[in-house]
Amino acid sequence: MAAKKSFIIKQKLAKAKNQNRPLPQWFRLKTNNTIRYNAKRRHWRRTKLVC
């Protein structure tokens, strides 16, 4: 990744960084909740971004 990034690329990287986290524990405790983990987790070395 270049040191000089365009603002659009920087925004996409920031969004991907925020999305790459586990589910909050309080969300798992909600009634009738079937979601157990974040299926869209991304590892920085295994799966690269398309942006």
From Swiss-Prot:
Record-linked InterPro entries: Ribosomal_eL39, Ribosomal_eL39_CS, Ribosomal_eL39_dom_sf
Assigned keywords, A-Z: Ribonucleoprotein, Ribosomal protein
An example Gene Ontology molecular-function term: structural constituent of ribosome
GO cellular component: a single term: cytosolic large ribosomal subunit
One BP term from GO: translation
Coiled coil: none
Pfam family, one: Ribosomal_L39
Subunit: Interacts with YIH1.
Family (UniProt): Belongs to the eukaryotic ribosomal protein eL39 family.
Protein name: Large ribosomal subunit protein eL39
Source organism: Kluyveromyces marxianus
Upper lineage: Eukaryota, Fungi, Dikarya, Ascomycota, Saccharomycotina
Gene: RPL39
